[in-house]
Structure formats: C-alpha cells, structure tokens
C-alpha cells in the first residue's frame, strides 16, 4: 500500500558491507546469515487473533455504514520484494489477509508476512468521499527493522466526491522520519467488474501515486478496485521502485479478494 524506507543513513549500509567483507575474506559462507531474508507467512488463524485482540473495547459508529465491515478478509496474492544489496529477495505467500479494524475510520492492514505489514487508514466523508489520512509500513529485512509513517491531509482521496472516470487530484503528504514532503497524485480510472467467489462485483478503479524526491527517490503507484458504497478493497496492485543510500528497493504485488464476507 506504501513505500517502505529502510536506509536512513550510510552508517548502517557501511556496517553491513563491512561485515560481508570481513566474513567472506575468511573463506566461509557465514555471510548468508547476515543477509538472510526471513519470511514468516501470516495465516488466517494468526490474522484472526490479531483482529480480535485489536477489537477489544471498540464500538461501531454510524460512519461505518460507508466503510468495510470489520473482520479478516482473504486475498489471492502474487508478488514479492527485493533489495539491490546482495540479492536479498523474498516472495509473498499465495494467500494473504487484510484486517479491517473497527472505529470511526477503518484501519486496513495487509499482513502477508510478519516481517512486512502495510496499514492504510480509510475515512468516509460527505458525498461518498474516501480519504487516506495515514499510511504505515513496518519492515524487517537484511537485519534492519523500520517503521515508515506518512501523514496526509483530508484531500488525499482514495475516492473523491462524485467520482467519475478521468478525475484527477493531488495532495502533499509528510513522511515523519526523515521529515520530508511527498506528493500524492490520484486518478479515477472508471468503473469495472471483478469476480469474487463466482459473484460479479461492481467497483471503481482508482490509482494514487506517491512520489519521493528527498532522501529517498522514486515512485510508489498503487491501484485500488473499491466498492464505492462500503470502501471495501476488492483488488489492489502495488509497484514500488525507490533508491535510498545507494540501495534500491523494489516491490510488486497483486491481491484479489476471495470472499466478500470477512471472518470474525
């Protein structure tokens, strides 16, 4: 859903490279332990446990009539992520979960593996608008643990008011650490139909692209196929290509909903 940033300065990169040089010079293969890319899939049972834990003491509000029903949704997924450093790469599981939390705004968390999660806050507004005030990615890869938080204004739409094909919108968001401005450019690509469990679902196809031009440089376009009346993400496609500190991070994913009813 959003760009992950992990190289915040050159010191971490230098330490990793130095470790590789020292160990490899000994003629061993222990360097693989330093750069081993761990991938622990989050199954449905674990996703349900996370959802139930986060629902404690939360209550429904009237605004939720225009947001996805809370619960755990299952998606058919392809794709993966990689770093240019030492060929670090891993694939996402073929089945992943999105956890929709209860609240005034919905928190939608894609949890393919425990080492990589993406959370989008989705709020409903007047005239059918769906906005995205916050995007959070947590990542553990190549020995580095990071959390990337992007805050956006009310005009950062997932779906604008009276959405029609060809609509365009922009907003300026802020990356918390390092503090940098990020441009969000949105586009409505029009209505579409997606088949879910044998049922045809009418959706609106939108895209928003995050452009980074600071410590990180690159783009992060994400396509959403959304049910306008509920904000349910029926399909999502994400591409990431960003360079930071001389290291390039790449991600691609396509997730399609397999059942319209969530598990709770």
Q: Which ranges hold each PLM region?
A:
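Intrinsically disordered, low-complexity regions
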Residues: 4, 57-60, 64, 138, ...
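N-terminal Sec-pathway targeting helices
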Residues: 2-22
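Acidic, serine/threonine-rich low-complexity disordered tracts
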Residues: 23-123, 173-264
């Amino acid at each position: 859903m959003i760009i992950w940033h992990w190289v915040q300065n050159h010191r971490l990169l230098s330490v990793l490279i130095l470790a590789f040089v020292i160990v490899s010079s000994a003629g061993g293969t222990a360097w693989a332990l330093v750069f081993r890319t761990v991938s622990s899939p989050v199954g449905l049972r674990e996703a349900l446990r996370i959802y139930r834990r986060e629902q404690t003491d939360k209550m429904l509000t009237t605004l939720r009539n225009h947001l996805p029903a809370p619960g755990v949704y299952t998606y058919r997924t392809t794709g993966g992520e990689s770093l240019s450093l030492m060929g670090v790469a891993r694939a996402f599981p073929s089945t992943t979960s999105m956890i929709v939390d209860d609240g005034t705004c919905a928190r939608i968390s894609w949890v393919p593996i425990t080492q990589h999660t993406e959370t989008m806050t989705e709020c409903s507004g007047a005239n059918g608008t769906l906005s995205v005030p916050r995007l959070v990615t947590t990542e553990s890869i190549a020995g580095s643990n990071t959390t990337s938080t992007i805050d956006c204004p009310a005009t950062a739409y997932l779906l604008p008011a009276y959405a029609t094909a060809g609509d365009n919108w922009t907003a300026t968001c802020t990356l918390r650490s390092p503090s940098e401005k990020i441009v969000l450019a949105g586009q409505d690509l029009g209505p579409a139909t997606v088949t879910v469990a044998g049922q045809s679902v009418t959706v609106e196809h939108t895209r928003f692209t995050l452009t980074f031009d600071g410590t990180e440089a690159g783009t992060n376009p994400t396509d959403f196929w959304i049910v306008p009346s509920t904000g349910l993400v029926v399909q999502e496609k994400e591409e990431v290509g960003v360079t930071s500190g001389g290291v390039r991070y790449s991600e691609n994913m396509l997730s399609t909903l397999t059942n319209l009813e969530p598990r709770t």
